[in-house]
């Protein structure tokens, strides 16, 4: 029994259920038409009315051609997930109950970014998704 005051505090965690791991779901997401580029990421997302445990799920992809070593690919993925974890409140506050957004971030650059650069890009991405989401809701 959590007091109401704690419901408005964003959770700064990124659980397993908030990550997209299913190959089938990622393939469905890649077939989605909703995408844009916010350098250094290409963003593909899908809004669905299937209720889930969390309002948003995320996956990060880094190409093997850009970074040969898995250590470097994992570093970029870790930075992107951390930036999402800290800023997901931007997205969570706007999503209606019963809706979910699946997000795939595809890294485009050839260099390992700093956390500040990654966080700035992820914030801009989340704000753009919120803007597109709210305009889509207003059209319905």
Predicted regions located by residue number:
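Positively charged, solvent-exposed patches that mediate nucleic-acid binding
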Residues: 1-140
């Amino acid at each position: 029994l959590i007091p109401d005051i704690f419901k408005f505090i964003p959770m700064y965690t990124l659980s397993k259920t908030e990550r997209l791991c299913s190959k089938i779901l990622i393939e469905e997401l890649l077939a989605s038409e909703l995408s844009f580029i916010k350098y250094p990421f290409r963003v593909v997302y899908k809004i669905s009315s299937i209720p889930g445990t969390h309002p948003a799920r995320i996956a990060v992809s880094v190409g093997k051609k850009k970074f040969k070593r898995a250590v470097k690919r994992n570093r970029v993925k870790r930075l992107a997930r951390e930036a999402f974890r800290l800023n997901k409140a931007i997205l969570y506050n706007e999503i209606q109950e019963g809706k979910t957004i699946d997000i795939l971030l595809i890294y485009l650059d050839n260099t390992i970014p700093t956390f500040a650069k990654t966080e700035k890009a992820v914030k801009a991405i989340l704000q753009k998704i919120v803007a597109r989401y709210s305009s889509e809701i207003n059209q319905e």
